[in-house]
Amino acid sequence: MFITRWLFSTNHKDIGTLYLLFGAWAGMVGTALSLLIRAELGQPGTLLGDDQIYNVIVTAHAFVMIFFMVMPIMIGGFGNWLVPLMIGAPDMAFPRMNNMSFWLLPPSFLLLLASSTVEAGAGTGWTVYPPLAGNLAHAGASVDLAIFSLHLAGVSSILGAINFITTIINMKPPALTQYQTPLFVWSVMITAVLLLLSLPVLAAGITMLLTDRNLNTTFFDPAGGGDPILYQHLFWFFGHPEVYILILPGFGMISHIVTYYSGKKEPFGYMGMVWAMMSIGFLGFIVWAHHMFTVGLDVDTRAYFTSATMIIAIPTGVKVFSWLATLHGGNIKWSPALLWALGFIFLFTIGGLTGIVLANSSLDIVLHDTYYVVAHFHYVLSMGAVFAIMGGFVHWFPLFTGYTLNDLWAKIHFSIMFVGVNMTFFPQHFLGLSGMPRRYSDYPDAYTTWNIISSIGSFISLTAVILMVFIIWEAFASKREVATVELTTTNIEWLYGCPPPYHTFEQPVFVKV
C-alpha cells in the first residue's frame, strides 16, 4: 500500500508532496555546501584543501540549489499542489508522466553526487565552460557524470513543462477563460514555456561538450575549427531564461500572498501583472550575452545587450508597484507569510538595482567575476526565490497538511533568516567593488573584515534553517487544526477543505455562467 501510494503515485497532491520533501532534503545538502564555502572564506588561509575541492563544492552548491531545491519546490511542489486546485481540474493532464518527472530527479541527484566522489570532481563552476571542462583540464568521469545529471534533470523539467502547459490550457472548466485564472497559474504556465524553449539548447550544448570530451569532436576546440565562445552562447541562452524560471513562480506566489493578507479580493492590475510576466518571459530570451561582456563582443552588440537588459526593469517595476498598490489601503494582517512577501519585495528590488548596475557593459567589464555579481544574484535568489518559497510554504502549509504553524515561532524564524541573509550578502557588494574575484578559496588580507562578517551571517542563516525544522515538527506535534479560511471565493484552492480530499473531484466539474 505504502509503495503503491508513494512510488507509483499518479496523484498531483502526493507527487507535489514528494517534490516538496525532495526539495527540502536537497536544500539541506545545498545549505551544507554553502556553509563549507563560507567556512573556507571565514578567514584568510586554507581550510579544506586546494581550489579544485573548493570549486567542486561551489559547483555542487549551485547545481543542488537550482535544480534540486528551487525548481522542484516551486514548480514541482507548489505547481503540482496548487495548479489543479486553482483551475478546478481533477488532476494533471498526464498523471503518470508527472510521476516520471519526479522520479527522474533522485537518479539525477545521485549522478551529481557521484561526479564529486570520482576522480577530482567537477570543479568547473555551474557554467561548465570548456576548455576547463574539457578532457585535459578535467580528465576522468566527473564532468561526464555531471553532464548526465543535467540531462536527467532537464528531461524531468521538459516533461513537467509539457504537463503544466497542457493542464492549464485544456483542463479549465469551459466557463473559465485564460484571463480569469489566478496569477500563480499564469506564472507556472509562462515558466513552463521558458523551460520548454530553453532546456533543449542546454541539452545540445552539454551533449556537444560530452562528444568533445569522449568522441574527439571539436565543437568547442579551436584546433579543430571549433569555438569555446559557441558553448557560452548556448549555455547562456539557457542560463538566462533559467534565472527567470527560478523567480517567476515566486512572483505568482507573492501576488497571492500579498493579495490575501491585504484583505483584497484581487491583486492590483491583474492584466498588467500577466502582461509583465509575459514580457519578462519574452525579454529573458534576448539578453543572454550580458553574461559575456568580457569575452570580446562587438561594441554595438554590447550596446544592444545593455539596452535590452535594462528594458526588463520596466515589467519588473510594474510588478513591484502593483504589489505595493495591492497592499495600499488594505486591511493588513501581519502574518508570517506577509512578512516573507514584504521581505521579498524589498530585497528583490535591491537585487534588481544591482542588476541594472551590472547591465552596463562598461561597468560589467570591471565587476564581472567579482563578488559584486555573487551579491547581486544571491539577493534575487537567496532573498527572492527562497523568501517566496518560505512565504508560500507558511501560507499554504495549512492547506497541505490541515495543521497550522505557530505564529510567533514563524515570525522569529523570519527575523533570524532576514538578519542572516543580509549579513551574509550585503558585505559582498563591498568586496566586489574592491575587486575580490569569485571562485577562489583564499584572498588577500585586505578583504578579511567583510568576509568574516559574511561568514558569521551564513551561520545565522543556518540557525534559521534548523529552527524551521523545529517549527514544522511543532506543527505536526501540536496538531492545531484549521478552523476557518477567509476569502475563499477568490482563493478557490481553499474551497475543498484543509487538507483537500485525496481526489478533489469524483466527476468532472462544470461552472455555469
UniProtKB/Swiss-Prot annotation:
Keywords: Calcium, Copper, Electron transport, Heme, Iron, Magnesium, Membrane, Metal-binding, Mitochondrion, Mitochondrion inner membrane, Respiratory chain, Sodium, Translocase, Transmembrane, Transmembrane helix, Transport. Heme a3 binds at residue 376. Fe(II)-heme a binds at residues 61, 378. Its cofactor is heme; Cu cation. Its EC number is 7.1.1.9. It holds the Pfam family COX1. Residues 1-11, 87-94, 171-182, 262-269, 328-335, 401-406, 479-513 are mitochondrial matrix. This is Cytochrome c oxidase subunit 1. The gene is MT-CO1.
